[in-house]
Amino acid sequence: MMSMASTTASPFCPSPMPRGRKCTVRVQAGAAGADASDKSLEIMRKFSEQYARRSNTFFCSEKSVTAVVIKGLADHKDQLGAPLCPCRHYDDKAAEVAQGFWNCPCVPMRERKECHCMLFLTPDNDFAGQDQAITLEEIKDATSKI
């Protein structure tokens, strides 16, 4: 599970953070501490890049945030068969996957461009970077110490 602040307040996002603050990520190991396979990591990396371009959104200026979220999506893809949002707590992950609401891209992202994980940020978001791409090496480097 990851936790971070967003600049848009909504029922799905925490309160806005003041300008100039850095976004941070806290991570807990997934079920049985399993790591994402390279195949799932690459699938989620490509998906994230394509969706960012298609939705005119950008990755966080702090690339480690992007890397951790993509790794979390890949972990869930391996463990659950679907890219369930890794930034939320679930009592029953399998039921959440079946419902589909929090499968990436989640309903709030598709309907209102509100990404709780800060993976897909609108250009006006204080934490939005300039990039819509990230390499597999960047993801592995950023997540290797977690």
From Swiss-Prot:
InterPro entries for this protein: FTR_bsu, FTR_bsu_sf
Highest taxon of source: Eukaryota
Catalytic EC class: oxidoreductase
Key words, A-Z: 4Fe-4S, Chloroplast, Disulfide bond, Iron, Iron-sulfur, Metal-binding, Oxidoreductase, Plastid, Redox-active center, Transit peptide
Record-listed E.C. numbers: 1.8.7.2
Catalytic activity: [thioredoxin]-disulfide + 2 reduced [2Fe-2S]-[ferredoxin] + 2 H(+) = [thioredoxin]-dithiol + 2 oxidized [2Fe-2S]-[ferredoxin]
Transit peptide: 1-26
Cystine residue pairs: 87-117
Binding site for [4Fe-4S] cluster: 85, 104, 106, 115
Matches recorded under Pfam families: FeThRed_B
Location in the cell: Plastid, Chloroplast
Needed co-factor(s): [4Fe-4S] cluster
Catalytic residue list: 87
Any single Gene Ontology cellular-component annotation: chloroplast
Subunit comment: Heterodimer of subunit A (variable subunit) and subunit B (catalytic subunit). Heterodimeric FTR forms a complex with ferredoxin and thioredoxin.
This protein's name: Ferredoxin-thioredoxin reductase catalytic chain, chloroplastic
Organism of provenance: Oryza sativa subsp. japonica (Rice)
